[in-house]
Amino acid sequence: MIKKIQTSLIALVVSVFGFFSVPLSTASAADCSVHIGDFDWDSANIHTAIGAYILENGYGCDVQVTKGSTNPILAALIDNQIDIIFEHWTDNNVQLIDPELESGNLVFLGVNTPASEQAFFVDRATSEKHNITSVEDLAKPEIAMLFKDPENPEKGRLTSCISGWTCYTINLVKLKEYGLDDLYTNFDPGSGGALDAAIKAASTKNQPIVTYYWTPTSLMGKPEIDLIRLTEPAYDESCWNDMMTVVEDIKANGPEVYKPSCACEYKDMALTKLATGKFAKEQPAIIDFANAYTIPTAVVNNMLAYYV
């Protein structure tokens, strides 16, 4: 993905520089070595590719990129094995990241994309035919069977996040709290590409699908993909924090430690950037650039539609 983007990125970078005003450094690669953490979804790949290109060609840095799922990349960042990440879904990892920010081990670098959403979606045709507009509407056996899981045909399938993403465990807890875990599996598609492929296949074959998804993405900008966001209990900070305590416990100790809590919708949020405190002290010019780096959501969607 990064190589594909960088082959035609020069003109894009010229236009992107209109969004920030930090002068390029003349530091040599010997003075600037950057290890960027990247993730296994498209918008993060875009930001990583742009950041890496600018750091290599504008700042003369020696850039290394390590790609992986949320949990191992954030663990590597906390352990100072990675220097910086250019996309972070803040509210999905509050319990993990906030203590690191408070201690100074990590530093917050501002917003990269001002608006995003993540939620449960149903294809429009199924939503309109069966009047499915909320998670409550999923709580009927006959509705669950519309989304039958071929690997567990007694249940419906919620096409969920990848198990290495925090949202996989969030969705697991949500299914339990909404009383849906006896009716639906929390299906791990295996990769972000496989998640996209499942949604595309359902659309092409006119098959029902209930799925977790998010924006910004290239898929949501395609005219043939028509998904309806399901309503959930409104976002509540106290409820969310209680739920995330359970989520982090499950991530650390396994699903058997689940304790009833509460659940609510994902918070629509700005996506952010993080670096280690050590790197911030050593490379203030790079931190100035990273703080200034931000691209409007509509531009990110257009880039994703073009490149992906």
Please place each PLM-identified region on the residue numbering:
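Short helix-initiation/N-cap motifs at beta->coil->alpha
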Residues: 39-42, 62-76, 186-197
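A conserved helix-loop-strand patch within extracytoplasmic ligand-binding domains
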Residues: 105-160
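C-terminal lobe and pocket-closing loops
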Residues: 223-294
